[in-house]
Amino acid sequence: MKNKPFWVQPLASLPLSLKPIAAIQQKHYGAVLNPTRWWGRMPRLFWLVALFVGYLERKNARLDPGLRALLMTRVSQQCECAFCIDANSLRLAQRSGAMDKVQAVAQWRDSALFSPAERVALAYAEAVTATPPVVTEAEKEALHRHFGDAQITEMTALIAFQNLSARFNAALDIPSQGLCSPKGKPHA
């Protein structure tokens, strides 16, 4: 973590109940992920949040893994969460196999890299992330042309989860960890 003074200090040492997840993060990323040091003040809630995202990211999820990463990246950008943009950009780069899509997310409306279904989902993610959420009838109809009710429900849960995560991290100024390098090569 950078030597920036935090207005809410991260934990220097994690509770015993979070040591297993810290070990997994250390092995996979080479470090304990920054948000863990803040969520660590509430280990039970941390595990509930981890279970929530774990369910949304399960192998038999209703949404394609690349679409999930795309939506999480866009919500992270809207919430201006440095850590989330970094982590979700890495996930999107890994799942799409290229950095060009990652670099085009913020300008998705002007990019040919996104499918019609991705465009509809991105518009929905932006509408749900707005405060208050404003989803138009046209957006609802467009969603139904590409996704079923179960997929839309799961998409909404994913967007809501990413809003929770990004707003928590952004409010506490949790920094990026350089997981997805700016030079076009993802780490890990």
What function would you assign to each model-found segment?
Residues 1-188:
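Hydrophobic alpha-helical segments
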